[in-house]
Amino acid sequence: PNPFNPETWIPFDLSEAADVTVRVYDMQGREVRRVALGYLDAGAYRGRADAVYWDGRNEVGEPAASGVYVYELRAGEFVERRRMVIRK
C-alpha cells in the first residue's frame, strides 16, 4: 500500500481463524485509527473486497497528514507491523 492518497487496502493472510484488528499509528506512536474486523476464518484476504480498508482518516473523520505511518495487524497471537506512506 505504498505510497497512497487518500485511501489504501492492506492485504493479509490468516493461517487459522482469529479475531483481527488493525491499528494505524503516526511516527510519534499515537494511534490514528483502529479497524476491528472481528472473528475471521482462515484464508487469504487480498482483494479490495477482503483486505483491510483505510480511508486515510483518523478516528474523528479528519484526513491524516502526509507522512509515514505504521499499521499493526493483530490476529490472535500473530502481530505484524509495516510502514506505509500517505502522499498528498
What do these predicted ranges mean?
Residues 3-28, 34-38:
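Glycine-centered coil/turn sites that cap beta-strands in beta-rich domains
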Residues 7-9, 19, 49-51, 68, ...:
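Intrinsic-disorder/low-complexity, polar/charged segments enriched in Ser/Thr/Lys/Arg/Asp/Glu/Gln
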Residues 17, 34, 62-88:
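C-terminal tail/sorting-segment detector
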Residues 23, 53-55, 70-72:
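Residue-level detector of beta-strand face positions
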Residues 26, 58, 75-77:
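Surface-exposed loop/turn motifs at beta-strand-loop junctions within extracellular Ig-like
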Residues 39-48:
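Short proline/glycine- and polar residue-rich coil/turn motifs
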